[in-house]
């Protein structure tokens, strides 16, 4: 993000406050006719309902509840509800202590953090949560044998010796996290990170009870019976990754259990937005999944049941360069320029989402009060004529007249509608292209992406911490989250500089990140950004204290109260 030569953390605090003001909406900024923040307010004078049970619909299953293996927002959100790390985000997006007993102390160059832990934090089986639980989980995340999808990506180049351990050149105990005693952690960084405090709120960094994990063996986290919890709620029902319903109940061993009012949350999966809206109207659910259908949303415009906010998540087309045709830059440029993004957001989504000709979202990152987007360019703007020229040139270079691609999409109704529009746009504007859509459950979509078993794929990304780098370093050569076989040494060089040499030179670092964005989107057309998403939920007005987050988990449920 932004740092000053005198004090990285001081400026980070200022930057984060600006980021939060832009992202959280602050209650005054309405991005639509629905209610943007009203359900966050507690309604101090309202009486509580006799039964504090919340019913929630979600649009996807939970692929895993193992915090070092989670790589999706459903997993992150459920982990956030049932567990707690050193720090968490509060309802106003501020970093607050979780298991930590206060904020970190730093050495002079901000590369060593010392964190005291609360001595009353407990696991749901009664065991104390100690510094050793954090050391174990962090080491497990970076251990090559674990094959964590996020561990190496998140830690390498940031936590001391993470890169060396991931590459088999150092031992696990060399990782830059030490238990000085049962309740004192020391974290050593490769270099100062201006966003370190928001960074370690992420679910990957949650503790794990080594004795329990190892006792479960291969069964660990396979269902609710093989999990421990140290957060606001515990799972009392979840049959594993294919389960379409699960139950959370208040965790009485949680440190701040006295502040948790809900006694139970019932979750069910609904992949049909109309069915979700019907269930809400019938009073069968209190909160729906994110809704995108204009026909549904139009019925609730102006209603206090509609919660709408712009989130810093970008959706794009990924292009797998293991396919020889997609290795061709002109073919990729043609695809990137051929989709009518305005029609997509206005006519298909029609939910407040905006066109994205960029990677780092609007209203997310600021330097000296200026939005990253205001000083960066806009890339891959829709241009069907140019797209056709690139397409013809690419086909000629490949020596073919037709190309067929497999497009892997999700099996929700919203995804199917969007995917059908993408197919129509590409086939209509790029003669000779045949696109076959395969709609699959979320877990399978992730698996196919990870195995490179796709040609085109609709992907998206929400930030994991408060800095543009959370979007940019995804695309470095060999990046753990890339799964496209993309590589550009100049891009890698700029990202490395922004991560290392320029960390205390905010203006130069900003320029490097913006130059890297241009290479990725304009020069190489490695991905095709489509839109920045607006979130629309239906939520019972009697539900107070519902909090949504700008990065990491989507929501927090622990502050919810149900009124009469």
State what each model feature region is.
Residues 252-298:
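Ligand-site clamp/hinge motif
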Residues 183, 189-259, 264, 274:
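Gly/Pro-rich hinge or "lid" segments in bacterial periplasmic/extracellular proteins
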Residues 130-137, 182-188, 262-264, 282, ...:
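Alpha-helical secondary-structure segments
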Residues 57-108, 228:
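N-terminal lobe/hinge region of extracytoplasmic solute-binding protein
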């Amino acid at each position: 993000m932004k740092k000053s030569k005198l004090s990285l953390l001081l400026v980070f605090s200022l930057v984060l406050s600006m980021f939060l003001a832009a992202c959280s909406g602050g209650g005054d900024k309405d991005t639509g006719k629905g209610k943007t923040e009203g359900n966050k307010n507690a309604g101090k004078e309202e009486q509580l309902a006799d039964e504090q049970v919340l019913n929630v619909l979600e649009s996807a299953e939970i692929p895993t509840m193992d915090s070092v293996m989670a790589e999706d927002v459903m997993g992150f959100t459920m982990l956030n509800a049932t567990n707690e790390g050193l720090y968490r985000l509060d309802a106003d997006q501020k970093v607050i202590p979780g298991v930590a007993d206060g904020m970190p102390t730093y050495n002079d160059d901000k590369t060593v953090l010392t964190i005291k832990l609360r001595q009353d934090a407990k696991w749901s089986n009664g065991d104390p949560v100690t510094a050793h639980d954090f050391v174990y989980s962090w080491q497990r995340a970076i251990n090559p044998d674990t094959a964590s999808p996020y561990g190496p990506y998140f830690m390498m180049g940031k936590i001391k010796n993470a890169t060396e351990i991931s590459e088999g050149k150092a031992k696990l105990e060399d990782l830059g996290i030490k238990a000085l005693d049962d309740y004192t952690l020391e974290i050593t960084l490769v270099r100062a990170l201006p966003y370190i405090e928001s960074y370690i709120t992420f679910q990957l960094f949650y503790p794990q009870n080594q004795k329990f994990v190892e006792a479960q063996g291969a069964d660990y986290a396979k269902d609710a019976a093989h999990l421990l919890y140290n957060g606001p709620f515990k799972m009392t029902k979840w049959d594993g990754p294919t389960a379409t319903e699960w139950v959370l109940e208040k965790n009485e061993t949680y440190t701040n259990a006295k502040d948790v009012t809900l006694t139970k949350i019932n979750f069910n999966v609904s992949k049909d937005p109309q069915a979700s809206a019907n269930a809400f109207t019938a009073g069968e659910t209190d909160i729906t999944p994110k809704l995108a259908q204009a026909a549904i949303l139009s019925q609730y415009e102006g209603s206090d049941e509609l919660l709408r906010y712009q989130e810093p998540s970008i959706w794009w087309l990924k292009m797998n360069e293991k396919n020889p045709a997609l290795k061709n830059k002109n073919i990729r440029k043609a695809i990137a320029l051929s989709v009518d993004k305005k029609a997509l957001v206005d006519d298909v989504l029609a939910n407040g989402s905006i066109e994205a000709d960029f990677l780092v979202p609007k209203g997310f990152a600021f330097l000296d009060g200026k939005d990253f987007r205001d000083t960066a360019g806009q890339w891959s703007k829709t241009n069907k004529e140019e797209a056709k020229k690139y397409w013809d040139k690419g086909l000629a270079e490949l020596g073919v007249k037709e190309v067929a691609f497999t497009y892997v999409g999700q099996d929700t109704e919203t995804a199917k509608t969007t995917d059908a529009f993408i197919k129509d746009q590409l086939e209509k504007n790029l003669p000779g292209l045949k696109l076959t859509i395969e709609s699959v459950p979320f877990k399978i979509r992730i698996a196919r992406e990870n195995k490179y078993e796709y040609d085109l794929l609709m992907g998206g990304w929400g930030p994991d911490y408060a800095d543009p780098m959370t979007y940019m370093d995804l695309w470095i050569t060999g990046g753990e989250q890339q799964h496209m076989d993309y590589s550009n040494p100049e891009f890698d060089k700029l990202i490395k500089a922004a991560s290392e040499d320029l960390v205390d030179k905010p203006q130069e670092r900003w320029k490097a990140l913006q130059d890297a964005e241009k290479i990725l989107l304009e020069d190489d057309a490695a991905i095709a950004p489509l839109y920045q998403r607006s979130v629309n939920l239906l939520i019972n007005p009697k539900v107070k204290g519902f909090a949504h987050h700008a990065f990491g988990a989507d929501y927090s449920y622990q502050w919810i109260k149900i009124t009469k």
